[in-house]
Amino acid sequence: LEFAVTPDTLIPRGDSETIVQAALDCAAQDARVLDMGTGSGALLLAFLHERPGARGVGIDASAAALAVASANGQRLGLAKRAQFVQANWLEAGWEHDLGRFDLVLCNPPYVESDANLDPDVREFEPATALFAGPEGLDDYRAIVPQLGKLLVPGGVAIFEIGAGQAEAVGAIASESGFAAETRRDLADRPRALIVR
């Protein structure tokens, strides 16, 4: 699948395929999916493309990113099963009208604030989609405790994680009463955390 991107969205990377594959392994054919921080819509739309009975909601704080995601959904013929909503998980009450989901996908910001990034990434991708505090964990700390309000009983959340973050994000999940399992990417690095 090809996705349009703009400076308002992250460029989809091959590593994120680990998230989609884990989602396909974990979710039913008719799953209701929430994609948090949808950006270009790549995770949600790739999942819906592979699961014709599924439907989903992509949220993002950026209206410009949501316009890109919506256009990608239209272009890929998935617009009837994908809804895009402006919401910021750092604001109280953001989830009230969304309902519950079988599957939550999330590639949150997870880069440490002072990280040295490739100039192409730092200059051309939105900082709000990259940086998450001094340890890169701020967004996980905000999202994971809210999963109980988002998931149906037996639901699953799948997070993309950065290098060296599996143990820390797993501990955040454990503190909130969830079990976590790591999935490795094609380079054999921990890339996804499956939270139940």
List where the protein language model places each region.
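Residue-level signal for the nucleotide or nucleotide-sugar donor/cofactor binding architecture
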Residues: 10-14, 64, 68, 125, ...
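Helix-to-beta-strand junctions that scaffold the AdoMet/dcAdoMet cofactor pocket
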Residues: 78, 125, 151-153
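Conserved Class I SAM-dependent methyltransferase catalytic core
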Residues: 134-195
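Conserved SAM/SAH cofactor-binding pocket of Class I
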Residues: 11, 17-114, 118
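Short loop/edge segments at beta-strand edges and connector loops
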Residues: 5, 86-87, 161, 184
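Conserved beta/loop motifs at nucleotide-recognition and modification sites
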Residues: 1-2, 8-11
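Generic structural signal for residues in well-ordered beta-strands
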Residues: 3, 82-84, 180
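Mobile active-site "lid"/loop adjacent to the S-adenosyl-L-methionine
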Residues: 108-139
